[in-house]
Amino acid sequence: MKRTIQTLTLSVFIFSAAIAWMGETPLQAEEPRRPVPVIFDTDIGNDVDDVLALGMIHALEVRGDCRLLAVTITKDNPLAASFTDAVNTFYGKGDIPIGICQSGVTPQSGKFNILAEKKDNGKLRYPHDLKDPQQIPDAVTVLRTALADADDHSVVIAQVGFSTNLANLLQSPGDKISSLTGKELVKQKVKLLSMMAGAFEKIPHKGKLVDHREYNIVKDIPAAQTLAREWPTPIVWSGFEIGLNVAYPHESIEEDYNYTSHHPLAEAYILYNPPPHDRPTWDLTSVLYAVFPHRGYFDLSETGTVTVQADGLTTFKPGDGQQRYLKLTDAQRVRVVEALVQLSSQPPQK
C-alpha cells in the first residue's frame, strides 16, 4: 500500500510538472525577441579591428540580435566617415546615420580608409554617398538624436575608439533634440557602455610584464578621464589584454570572404597588415559583450571604479561603483574566436 501511495504521489507530481511546463512554454515562445539597440563609436582607420567589428554588427542585425542606430567616429579624417558609409552600404544599410568630430586627433587617412575612393573602370568599388565632409553631421548631434528617439534604458553603446564623442555628449546642454542635458539623456536612455579601452593586467614586453597605457586612452586622456569619472550608467571595459589574447586567424581572411570578388573587411585587413598576420580582436570583443552579455563568452571582475591617470594608465578599485572589466579563460577564448570569425565573415543579406 505504501508503495502504491508513493507511486501515485510521484505520478501526480510528474503530471503537475508537465502541465506547468506546457503552460509556460507557449508564453516563452510567444515572447518577441527584441534586438539590442546599438550605437557604434569608433576610430575606424587607425586599426582594422574596427572594420571587423562593424561587419559583426551587421551580421548580428541580420540575425535579429541587434539594431544599429548610428555610427559616430573619433578619427578626425573625412575618409573615415566615407569608408564607414561604404561598409554600411555593402551590407545594405547605407542609411545608417554617421557623425564625426573635429578634434585634430589622428587626422591621417590611415591605411585602408582610402578604399572609399577606390575605383574600378571609373566606378567606386564600394559605392557610398557620403563624399562631402560638409554634409556629415557632428557626432554629438547624431548621438543625441539616436538616444532621444530610443526607449528608456535600452541602448547599448560600443565605444571602441577614443572617448572624445561620449565625453562631449556628457557635456552637451539641452537643445531642440531634447531638453535633457547629455548626462541626463545618457542616464535615461543608455543601458550599458561596452568599451574597448585601458588595460587591467600587465602586458608582456621584451620578456617582462609591464604596465600598459592603452592607445584609445592616451590619444584623448582628458576625455577618457571624464568618461570614467562621470558616465552615469554601467560600464564594462574590455582591456588591452582581452583582444591581445584573442587573435583573428588569418586563414579566415584568405578563405572566408571569397563569396564576392571584393570585400571591404578582407581588403582592409590586407592593407593594414596582411596574412599570415593574426590581428588581435580588441574592438570585436566589446561588440560581442555588448550584444551578448549573458552568453558566458567572458567573465567579469567585481564591481568598482576605473581611474584614468594623467599619463593614461588605467587602474581599477573594487567597491562601490558601476564599472567592471572583462576576464577571459582559455576555454572561453576558443569559443570567442569561433564566434568572431563566424560573425565577421557572414555574407551580407541586402
Task: List each language-model region with its residue ranges.
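Positively charged n-region of N-terminal signal peptides that target proteins for export
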Residues: M1-L10
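Bacterial N-terminal signal peptides
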Residues: T9-A20
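N-terminal acidic, glycine/proline-rich low-complexity segments
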Residues: P26-K350
